[in-house]
């Protein structure tokens, strides 16, 4: 299932995510198999780009590399670009972080 939400590009690995704001804590949820997106919960409110900044900071801590929104959007459905060389790097981290694979 993880392979369905990530895609390798020249710049890194893209991950399709679905963001929930105003959460109790920042965390990686599960993979939504109907939307084919990784659930990411963020404490921050979606006001003036604060949630987007919180997403980037949180994912950067998890992946230990640069992360960017691709493109920046106000929608809860987003795609993030993880700066890394291999899909396997992202898959291994997601397997560790996802609540139920």
Curated annotation (Swiss-Prot):
| Entries under InterPro entries matching the protein | DUF167, YggU-like_sf
Q: Which SMART domains match?
A: DUF167
Q: Name one GO cellular component term.
A: cytoplasm
Name the record gives this protein: UPF0235 protein Mevan_0378
Q: Which family does it belong to?
A: Belongs to the UPF0235 family.
Q: Which Pfam families match?
A: DUF167 (PF02594)
Taxonomy, superkingdom: Archaea
């Amino acid at each position: 299932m993880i392979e369905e939400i990530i895609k390798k590009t020249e710049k890194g690995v893209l991950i399709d995510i679905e963001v929930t704001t105003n959460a109790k804590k920042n965390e990686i949820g599960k993979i939504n198999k109907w939307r084919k997106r990784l659930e990411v919960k963020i404490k921050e409110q979606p006001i003036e780009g604060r949630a987007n900044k919180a997403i980037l900071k949180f994912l950067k801590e998890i992946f230990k590399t640069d992360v960017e929104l691709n493109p920046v959007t106000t929608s809860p459905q987003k795609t993030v670009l993880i700066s890394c060389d291999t899909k396997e790097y992202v898959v291994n981290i997601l397997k560790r972080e996802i609540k139920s694979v």
